[in-house]
Each structure stands twice: as structure tokens, then as C-alpha cells.
């Protein structure tokens, strides 16, 4: 089974991420996962017995939970998870990396130094 990532969020306090995915017959799920690979909009993932393939390559991704999709649940995650990169097309600098547990920003932002 393949899922296409339609949207994503990262949680800087837990080091986890959420991916809104769509599969066969437009069946949607929200994947809560952790790993050293960030699923971006447009990524295609395939769960396999040996792990998770993302865009055809095995990646270090651990799926923590799969939620059935609802607008209310996705909105709740979006409203409660505070990351400057969530919901924007690009982010170049982040003033909040001191509070972030990610070693490298999943969105590619650099730390703002003052």
C-alpha cells in the first residue's frame, strides 16, 4: 500500500512529526512518526515488513501511531504544535531553535543569532 503525503507538521518539543496521508480511494490517515527523515508534502511512503520506504528508499522512520483523518483532529494538531515552519512554504531563519529538540531543522531553517 502506498500513501502520498499531503501535509506535514513537526513538534519541536517532542522531536516527532505528523504527516497527513492519502491512499487508495482517497482514504486519509494522520501518521505520527519519529526518525531522521522528514516526510514532505509530495513524498510517497510504503510500509513494508522490513520498515518504511519513502520515495522508494528505506528510511529510518518509526510510525508511533496512525490516526483516522478528520479535519478537527488535524486542525487541533496544527493549532497546538508551535513550530514556525509549520504551514509556511519556506523558512530561512528560526528564533526558536533553543527550545527545539531537532538537531537539524526539518524545514532547513538556520538559527537567528543576535
Swiss-Prot record:
GO BP annotation list: cellular response to starvation
GO cellular component, one term: cytoplasm
Subcellular location: Cytoplasm
Annotated signal peptide: none
Keyword Transferase carried by entry: no
Keywords: Cytoplasm, Stress response
Function statement: Involved in the stabilization of the sigma stress factor RpoS.
Similarity annotation: Belongs to the IraM/RssC family.
Name of protein: Anti-adapter protein IraM
Organism: Citrobacter koseri (strain ATCC BAA-895 / CDC 4225-83 / SGSC4696)
Amino acid at each position: 500500500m502506498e500513501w502520498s503525503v499531503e501535509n506535514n507538521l513537526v513538534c519541536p518539543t517532542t522531536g516527532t512529526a505528523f504527516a497527513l496521508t492519502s491512499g487508495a480511494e482517497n482514504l486519509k490517515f494522520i501518521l505520527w512518526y519519529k526518525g531522521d527523515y522528514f516526510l514532505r508534502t509530495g513524498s510517497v511512503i510504503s510500509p513494508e515488513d522490513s520498515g518504511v520506504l519513502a520515495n522508494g528508499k528505506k528510511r529510518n522512520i518509526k510510525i508511533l501511531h496512525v490516526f483516522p483523518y478528520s479535519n478537527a483532529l488535524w486542525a487541533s494538531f496544527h493549532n497546538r504544535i508551535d513550530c514556525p515552519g509549520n504551514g509556511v512554504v519556506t523558512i530561512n531563519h528560526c528564533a526558536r531553535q533553543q527550545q527545539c529538540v531537532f538537531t537539524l531543522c526539518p524545514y532547513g531553517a538556520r538559527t537567528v543569532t543576535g
